[in-house]
Design a protein with these regions (language model features):
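Conserved alpha-helix/loop element of class I SAM-dependent methyltransferases that forms part
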Residues: 134-137, 144, 155-169
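Short, aliphatic-rich beta-strand segments
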Residues: 145-151
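Generic local-structure boundary detector
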Residues: 52-53, 95-99, 151, 158-160, ...
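N-terminal auxiliary segments of SAM/dcSAM-dependent transferases
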Residues: 1-143
Length: 169
């Protein structure tokens, strides 16, 4: 029984009916309120503009939502997840379209037939982290060499159990 492999990759996004542009001249507060009203936000100029918007979104939600109990923390995380996934980055010719954006090799490898599309900012952050782990490798104490995990592959970040297993062997 041979089934076609399905590649685990972020699904390209579609801009909402109302999409606003966010650059260094944009008002952060107005942008956050537009996002709460359902607008998508396309990051322009610099990658750091997206980082700034997500940081300010965290601050805004921290001031507006209680974050003490488990239920409140879940509500906070759900709201942050919903709003942060309305922040979009344009991918053109397999590159993030803003200045000073990281070069992410996974974009070309995972989307060979789709050179131009949109991804949410958190998806791009995830692809960037995964690319760095793949490119630089991850040291696992019980192995002689680094591992280079592909996007979407689980690898342990705590190694206590692996060290115990190695000692047992």
């Amino acid at each position: 029984m041979s089934e076609a492999l399905q590649i685990n990759k972020p699904t390209p996004s579609i801009a909402g009916e109302k999409t606003i542009r966010f650059d260094s001249k944009s008002d952060v507060r107005e942008t956050i309120y537009a996002m709460k009203a359902g607008a998508s936000v396309l990051i322009a100029e610099f990658y750091s503009n997206g980082m700034l918007l997500l940081k300010e979104l965290h601050k805004h939600l921290s001031n507006r939502l209680p974050n003490k109990t488990f239920a409140e923390q879940r509500a906070y995380r759900a709201e942050y997840h919903k709003l942060s996934n309305q922040v979009l980055l344009e991918i053109t010719a397999h590159q993030v379209e803003v200045h000073k954006a990281p070069k992410i090799g996974w974009i070309e490898k995972l989307y060979p037939d789709t050179p131009d599309f949109l991804l949410t900012f958190p998806q791009v952050q995830g692809l960037n982290s995964a690319w760095q782990w793949y490119k630089n490798g991850v040291s696992v104490p019980v192995l002689r060499n680094k591992i280079h995990p592909y996007y979407g592959t689980y690898f342990p970040t705590r190694f206590d159990h692996l060290i115990l297993f190695d000692n047992w062997l």
